[in-house]
Structure formats: structure tokens, C-alpha cells
Amino acid sequence: GDVYKRQDIEISHFGAKALQEAKVSYRITDAYGKIYSHGIIGQADIPIGNLNHIGQVDFPLKDIPSAMKLNIEVQVEGTDAVNDWDFWVYPDTVDFASEDIYQTDTLDNKAREILEKGGKVLIKAGKKVTYGKEVVQYFTPVFWNTSWFKMRPPHTTGILLNPHHPLFREFPTEYHSNLQWWELLNRAPVMQFSDFGKDFQPLIQSIDTWFISRKIGVLFEANVLNGKLIMTTLDLDSTPEKRIAARQLKKSILDYMNSDDFHPEQKVEIQQVQELFTKVAGSPMLYTKDSPDELKPKIK
């Protein structure tokens, strides 16, 4: 049968008086304002108090053609009481087109051979990366200031990316993180790119704690030897039946690598990739009771 998104709607009302026969409406739109569904959820008295159940929205998903970010807006008609929430819709089944891509979790001999011959390699390195392991990434940002809390994690403050890059064609995103990134970013290892040159830019850059500001990230593409490489520390594979955002990002990556758009602009030496698995930066234990501006670390 048809797949529906079913959403219960509750209203907390703390106005001066109860609302009589209030009519509550909804609409579901995409990023361009196209309306996919709208209507009346219910009409009822809304007493003063918390979480008054109004009704539910049943939204059919069969007409959503591809992965998409949508927004549901709920309003008490005739008032300025309105709220809205983003949500993401992904295909129920996913086919991975990966015949011409060698997938591995390290820079092994076969990966080197394929890159030498001009092939495509996807390295899903995860926790095997050592250069960057001192940086602890949560989905939530740095608490207040790492210099006042003895470098306790988390050490990052979100991500930065170009949402128009073709790698994200099938994974709708803004230039920053949003809730669809939770299962991908929370506690994901990062890579440090301090030796990759000042102009090097990963496709998904993690933003370091501001008073150290290392160049770090979780996914990059590069021309390596004679081939093309994408390397990531994100978990794209585990429990795909539950982690549907991770599953969708994996599809988007593989489809991009199989497309004519896969032309990395940056060149990286094979030794630089290898050092991500061997080099260790160490943890800068920087701590001050003064203003964090007094800390001027020299990060090598």
C-alpha cells in the first residue's frame, strides 16, 4: 500500500484565555515553496495548558520523486500562532551503482594499483585514521569554551560544505549541518589536513574549536596518482535499514563517482593519504583561567 508520514499535532496554549472552536491548518512545502499538501487538521476548543492534541496529518509519500527536504507549517487560523518544522524524505529502497569503484577501508595495495591505472577508489576509513583522532566530534558544538574546560570534548562546532556540489545531488543539504546529519556526524572521526596545503578544501569540513582552528574534515576528493579518490571517515554502511540518511548519502556519493561530474580539482600525493593512517598529531592540552585570547598556540 501507499506509504504515509503520520504526524500528531499538539498545541501548547498560554494566552490570556482559552480559544473557542479554533481552526488549525497545515501545509507542506519544499524549499522552493511548492505546496505538496494542505488542509484543516481539526477545529476544537483549545484550553490554556500544555500539549493539547488537535489531530493528525497523514501525508502520502508516493508522489515524492526523489530525496527531498520538506517543511510542515501548522497555524491556528485567524491568529499569528504558527510554527514549522523541517523533515526529510528518502527513497524506501536504494540501489548502489558501484561496479567501477573499488571500496576499501584503508590505502591498501589494490587501492594504490587502481589509482595508478587511473581508476576510482572510495576509502571508508572510519576509526582507522590516526591523523585527526585527537579531535573529538559530536553533532552538538563546543560547550562554551574548550580552553576553560581543559580541552574536554566536543572540539568541533559543526560543518561547512558547498550544498551545490554534485556529490550532494541526491542528498539535500544546506551549507551547514541539520538534523539529517545527526547519525552521520555524531562521534564520527575526523581527518586533519594540516599537511595538505593552505588551499586544500575538503568537501565536508568540520569546524575546529575556534582558538586552534585546524583544517579538519570528514570527506574529501582528490586526484591521486593517475586516478580519482574520495575518502571519508563517515559511517556509510552500518545498519542501513535504520540509518536511512547514511544510506542515502552513500548512494549520492557512489552515483556522483559514476557520473561525468566526478572531476576533483585538487591533487594530493599518495604519501599524504598514507599519512592519514600513520601520522599522529597529539592532543594540545591548552588550558587557561584567563581570557582565551591569551592562548596563542602554535600548532604544527
What do these predicted regions represent?
Residues 99-146, 223-226, 232, 253-256, ...:
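Short alpha-beta junction capping motif
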Residues 34-65:
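Intrinsically disordered, low-complexity Pro/Gly/Ser/Thr-rich segments with frequent PxxP/GP/PP motifs
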Residues 127-132, 147-244, 261-300:
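Catalytic beta-strand/loop cores that center a nucleophilic Ser/Cys/Thr
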Residues 88-106, 264:
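Low-complexity, Pro/Ser/Thr- and charge-rich linker/hinge segments at domain boundaries
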Residues 3-4:
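Short, small-residue-biased leader/transition segments that mark boundaries at the very start
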